[in-house]
Structure formats: C-alpha cells, structure tokens
C-alpha cells in the first residue's frame, strides 16, 4: 500500500515538470489554416497531379517533426492541395524524397500497418470538437487504411471502413497521391459553410522521421485533434442520405462438425443509414462471420480465463460508443480484472464456438452534446438452449469542455431457466489538463434467482512527455455477475499503480527514449480482511528511432490461495501462501526492415517450483506483395508434483496481389492440446466495400478432425 501511494504522489507531483513546447509552436499551430477550392469538373484520380484544377489550389507545406527532433521542421518537404465539388473532397499531395527507389512499402492489403513504412495520413475533425476524427492513410503502393479516432487519439477504430479512392505514383523526386473522399462517407454539421479540424502526418521511414502539418507533441497520437489546424472554404456540402445496403450470400461444405450440416447455403443483409449528419443506424439480419480469422492460441499458466480479443467486424465498429473507462484500450491490470462491455459474449460460447445470430440493430453517433450507443442482438436457439436477446446502451453527455458523464445498461434476456442478467451503472470522466484524465464508474447487477452485486473502478491516467502514470482501484462484489462483460474474478478489491519516467537524449541519437518505471498492485477480498495477491516490479526500456526496442523487467509476487487449481495437463498447485520472483528481457528489431523479428525470455520461481518461457518471432518481407512470419513459444514448468512443457507454433503467409486482392494463410499448433489449426482466406474487393471471400478452415486433434470450405459474396448498394 505504501509503495502504491508513493507511485501516485511521485507521478502527480512531477506533472508540471514536463517540458512545455516552445512558445512559437502555439503560434505556428494557430496559423495552420488551408482553404479548399471549389471545382465544377471532377478530377481524374490516378495519383499524378497533372489535372489543371490542381493549379487553382494554394499548396500548404511546412510539416514539423514529431519524431525524432520534436517540433523541428521536417527534413522531407511535403506539399498538399485541397479541391472539392458537389460530391467529393479531393486531396493531392507531393511527398519529396531524395531516393524514391528506396521508399519502403511493407504491405498492400487493406488496413495495413501504417507506421512501419513510408506513408501519408489525412486526419479530419469534421465536427471540429477537437476530440474525434476520421483518418485516411496510404503508402507509396496505394494501400488503404481508414479509421476513426476517439478521445483525442486514445481510442482508435481501425475496423471502420468508408468508401473512398486513393491512387499513388512514384516519380524521380518522390511520390504523389490523390484522394477522392465522397462527402456522404463523412458525417459533419448541416451548415452552409464547413470548418473542419485538419492535420496530416507523414512517415519517412528511411529517415526514421514522423512529421505532422500542425505540430503534435511526441507522446500523443496524430489523431489528437486538440493540436489540429483548420480546413475551410467548403460550402454547400451535403452528406446525402448515406444509405448503404449490403446483401450477402454464403455457401460451403463442413465435414466433422456435430452441429452443422455437411452442406449449407444462406444469405442475409447488412444496412447502414445516416439518420442525421451525426447519427447512424446499423441493422443486420442473418448475421454471418464466416470470413473472420481464427483466434490466436495462447499458453495459460494462470488460474484465470484467457482473454481473446474481438475480431468480428460488426462488433468492432463504433467501439467508443460502448466503452467505459479510460483503460479499455490498453492491457492494464484494471482492464483484465473488469471490462464493463465485452462483445464476445454475443454469438460465441464460453469455449469460443459460434452461436448463430438472428440479427440486430445498432444506433451510434451524436445528438447535440450527447454521444449515443444503443445495440440489441438476438441469437438463435441451439439444441435445447433457447436463444438470448442482448441489449447494450450507453448515453454520455459533455457537461463542460473537461467533464463528461454517462449512464449505461447491459442486459441479457432469455426464455430458458436462466431468464435474465441486467447491469446498470454510471460513469464520470474529468480532463483537468491535456495530459491528465480521471475516471470513476460504478455498476450494479441483477440476476434471476440470485442476489445482486456491485462493481466499479476509479482511476487516474497521466500521459506527459517525461512522466506517465496509471493508478486506481477496482472493486467487484462476490455476488456481481455480468453476462456482457469480462470479469476475471469476483469478490475482490485491487489497488494498482504504475509510474514510468521517460528520458530522451539531447542532440543526435539513435535512441528515441529510455524508460524506467515501477508498478505495484495489491488484491484482497472485497471486505479487505484477507490479502490475496501482491505484485511489485521494475521495468526498463530502450526505444530506438528505427522502431527497434529492448525491454527488461523483474517482479516479486505474493499469492494466498484458498483452493488448489490445475496447471498444465495433469498437475495442480495446492492451496497455501506463496512468494516468488521472476524476471525477463525482450527485444524487437526494426519493423520496417525486410527481415525483422524479436524474442522474449522470462523465468524464475513459480509457485512451488520454477518456470521458464522463450518466445521468438521472425517476419520476412519478400516484397510489398508477399511476407511470411513465424512465431515459436515454449514454456517449461518444473514442480515437485511433476513437470510439463507447453509449445505454440504460428506460421503466417500474406500475399497481396494488389491493393484489392489478398491471400492470407495462418497455421497454428498447440502442443498442450496436440491440435493443429489452419485458416486460409482469399479476399477480392470487387468494388468499394464489396467482397468475395473463399475460406478454408481445418482443425486436427486426437479426438476431432474438422474441415470446412466457405464462400461469401457481398455487394454494397450506396444511395
């Protein structure tokens, strides 16, 4: 407890010690304004800036480094122009590069990794609320990545896909690009003249340089539009009805599944309707997720359930509408203990097996100062189990520019023997400074034939240039139950804290920053009369400008087990009090290199014995079109009761025939289960947001062999 308090006091006391940007940076940012020029004839989007209309627009330039030399002028010049007509916003950019033949293009697939190679990104804050934004990113190969940034870049929805076009061209003095973004792809105020927040980001990978048009401090994302400039000059723009219908048909052969017919064909419909310029309705009928990639296997040496991330597109869209708390976008302790909304509870069994979804509705967006999220989904009956109806609702209101509050409800209703589970709660967020946020939320559960319970969290988050801190408290009653959340264990209270000090070299250096930090957490029962877990540790890191990094850590753990738990195939750790130490080191190489990889080694005491874990990964980029990667992991556990070894193997091949046609293969082996899993996906984008998928899934284990070949065709109709 004393150590946790010391971390909090130290971090808060040093908040004001963080270096402020130079005084002239605010003046530069205030002057960052560019006008879009109206044209009457659409341009030809081919990546070559040879249309006469481009001469009508005044170019804007002068990008400022975010990395490595914060706020210095970028070493590569970038010029950007803006045009528009009745239907489209056009963006043309010339990115000068002294050796364009050495540009780095790592991938061509949709939603490529944006910062691991050369690239350009356009950030639009269309409501000019200085909090939320659209992002449109490309690379010299013309790949597309689009996303939504929320809460000043702290949350990012890379699964949002809009209709837009980009083409690029590499030339002797650099590379150029042209965007065409339909106004109906965007949401913006219904007013005669538009003024949007604007920023642009460029990655010049060989120079290890990230720069933005309007200067952004290096500790923040380029989606932090509190630091954006202004795009003006757009008049009489209309977002249109923004009605999208996407019918789909599926078919396939499934051999070896006890609950699925050998051959099956089906169809369904997805709908998206922009009710207002800021509020959208999504509907889905006969929802299908057959094209979703398989979960990555994990080694579990703990007594808790594993956490698998959501991969289904429908649930990944508009995540900020249902996210509660400041830590939901990270791997913090508080997130592992209590996640207020976990969409994998819908349409998936406890073992990750699909449960058919009849359909659902989702309403998300803004109405005045309110942010609204409403979703309802219905699953089918499975054998003797009736289907469930799930409801998720959250309404947030900005009380002031720095204070917001929300109320939320999550529920499951069924006609079976377990008829309902309902959770209601509220949340408060404060942002007293750009780098400091405070949260608090509480919720109460009601379950049929069971007593109700409480759960909640308070926390503080500091993201300074030199000082970073997380601290707070999590409480979960023993009687609390949440069928739409992730609760690692009940009947606990956890204090957690983490402080990191970043040290940045002065003058030229290959190192971006060094970090040293400490963390402490203490968990007791919910009455705080019995200590359950205490973990304290130190962390060290060296982060290089070329994206390579070295990390090391050491932890000391106290555990008070009131009952035994299984570990490995046949062993068990008996009840009792345990104290043990462990440590580890990890390295990741330059991610933009043709050959990259890394490793992690950890080990030490483990309950009554010892354990050691080694993980290695390697990625080989043959070209912008083809890349292969491999991951190997082995954990060896030695206990007085016996020993065991757990192995994981992952092999991946990504082949992008073009920015609109891809082949992905993912093969995994889980040694603990003696199971091979294969997933091969072919994806052709035959028109914007319209896909053809061919998917092969295979599972082989001593008790099960299952093979499935699936076909899915989607066709977007936009009005």
Give names to the regions the model predicted:
Residues 4-15:
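Bacterial N-terminal signal peptides
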Residues 17-398, 406:
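Structural preference for beta-rich elements and adjacent junctions enriched in aromatics
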Residues 187-194, 235-242, 278, 369, ...:
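Short loop/turn motifs that connect adjacent beta-strands in outer-membrane beta-barrel proteins
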Residues 215-240, 379-431, 549-602, 613, ...:
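Outer-membrane beta-barrel transmembrane domain signature of Gram-negative proteins
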Residues 247, 265-271, 279, 285, ...:
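Extended, hydrophobic alpha-helical segments in both membrane/secreted and soluble proteins
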Residues 257-259, 270, 302, 351, ...:
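Alpha-helix capping and helix-loop boundary segments enriched in small/acidic/polar residues
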Residues 355-361, 367-368, 374-376, 395, ...:
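Large, well-folded core regions of big proteins
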Residues 356, 441-719:
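Exposed, low-structure sequence patches enriched in small/polar residues
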């Amino acid at each position: 407890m004393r150590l946790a308090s010391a971390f909090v006091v130290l971090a808060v006391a040093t908040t004001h010690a963080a270096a402020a940007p130079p005084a002239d940076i605010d003046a530069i940012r205030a002057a960052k304004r560019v006008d879009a020029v109206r044209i009457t004839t659409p341009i030809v989007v081919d990546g070559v800036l040879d249309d006469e209309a481009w001469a009508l627009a005044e170019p804007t330039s002068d990008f400022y480094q975010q990395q490595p030399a914060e706020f210095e002028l970028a070493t590569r010049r970038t010029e950007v122009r803006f045009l528009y007509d009745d239907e489209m916003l056009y963006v043309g950019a010339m990115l000068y590069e002294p050796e364009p033949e050495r540009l780095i293009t790592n991938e061509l697939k949709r939603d490529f990794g944006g910062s691991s190679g050369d690239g350009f990104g356009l950030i639009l804050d269309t409501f000019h609320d200085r909090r939320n934004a659209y992002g449109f990113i490309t690379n010299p190969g013309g790949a597309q990545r689009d996303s939504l940034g929320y809460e000043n870049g702290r949350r990012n929805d890379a699964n949002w896909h809009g209709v837009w076009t980009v083409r690029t061209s590499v030339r002797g003095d650099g590379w150029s690009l042209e965007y065409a973004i339909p106004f109906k792809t965007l949401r913006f105020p219904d007013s005669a003249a538009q003024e949007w927040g604007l920023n642009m980001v460029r990655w010049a990978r060989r120079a290890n340089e990230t720069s933005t048009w309007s200067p952004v401090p290096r500790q923040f994302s380029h989606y932090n539009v509190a630091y954006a400039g202004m795009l003006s000059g757009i008049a009489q723009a209309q977002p249109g009805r923004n009605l999208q219908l996407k019918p789909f048909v599926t078919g396939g052969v499934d051999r070896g599944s006890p609950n699925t017919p050998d051959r099956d064909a089906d169809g369904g419909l997805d709908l998206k309707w922009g009710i207002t310029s800021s509020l959208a309705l999504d509907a889905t009928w006969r929802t299908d997720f057959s094209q979703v990639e398989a979960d990555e296997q994990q080694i579990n040496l703990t007594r808790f359930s594993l956490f698998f991330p959501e991969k289904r597109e429908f649930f990944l869209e508009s995540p900020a509408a249902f996210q509660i708390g400041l830590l939901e976008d990270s791997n913090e302790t508080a997130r592992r203990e209590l996640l207020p909304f976990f969409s994998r509870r819908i349409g998936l069994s406890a073992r990750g097996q699909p449960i058919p979804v009849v359909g659902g509705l989702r309403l998300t967006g803004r109405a005045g100062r309110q942010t609204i999220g409403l979703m309802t989904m219905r699953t089918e009956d499975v054998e003797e189990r009736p289907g469930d109806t799930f409801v998720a609702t959250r309404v947030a209101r900005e009380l002031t520019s720095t204070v917001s509050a929300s109320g939320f409800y999550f529920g499951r209703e069924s006609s079976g023997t377990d008829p309902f589970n309902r959770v209601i709660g509220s949340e408060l967020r404060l942002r007293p400074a750009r780098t400091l946020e405070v949260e608090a939320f509480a919720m109460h559960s009601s379950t049929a034939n069971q007593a109700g319970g409480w759960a909640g969290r308070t926390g503080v988050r500091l993201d300074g240039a030199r000082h970073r801190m997380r601290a707070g408290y999590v409480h979960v009653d023993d009687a609390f139950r949440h069928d739409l959340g992730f609760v690692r264990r009940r009947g606990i209270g956890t204090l957690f804290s983490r402080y990191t000090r970043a040290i940045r070299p002065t003058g030229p250096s290959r190192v971006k920053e060094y970090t040293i930090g400490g963390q402490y957490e203490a968990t007791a029962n919910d009455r705080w009369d019995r200590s359950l877990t205490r973990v304290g540790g130190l962390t060290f890191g060296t982060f290089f400008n070329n994206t390579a990094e070295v990390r090391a850590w050491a932890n000391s753990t106290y555990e008070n087990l009131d009952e035994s738990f299984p570990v490995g195939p046949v062993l068990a750790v008996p009840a009792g009090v345990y104290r043990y130490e462990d440590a580890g080191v990890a390295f990741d190489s330059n991610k933009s290199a043709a050959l990259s990889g890394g490793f992690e080694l950890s080990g030490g005491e483990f309950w009554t014995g010892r354990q050691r874990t080694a993980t290695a990964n390697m990625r080989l980029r043959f070209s912008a079109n083809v890349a292969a990667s491999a991951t190997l992991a082995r954990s060896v556990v030695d206990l007085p009761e016996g020993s065991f070894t757990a192995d994981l193997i992952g092999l991946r091949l990504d082949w992008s025939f073009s920015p609109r046609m891809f082949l992905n293969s993912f093969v995994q082996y889980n040694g603990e289960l003696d199971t091979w899993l294969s997933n091969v996906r072919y994806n052709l984008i035959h028109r914007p947001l319209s896909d053809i998928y061919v998917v092969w899934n295979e599972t082989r284990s001593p008790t099960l062999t299952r093979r499935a070949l699936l076909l899915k065709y989607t066709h977007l109709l936009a009005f």
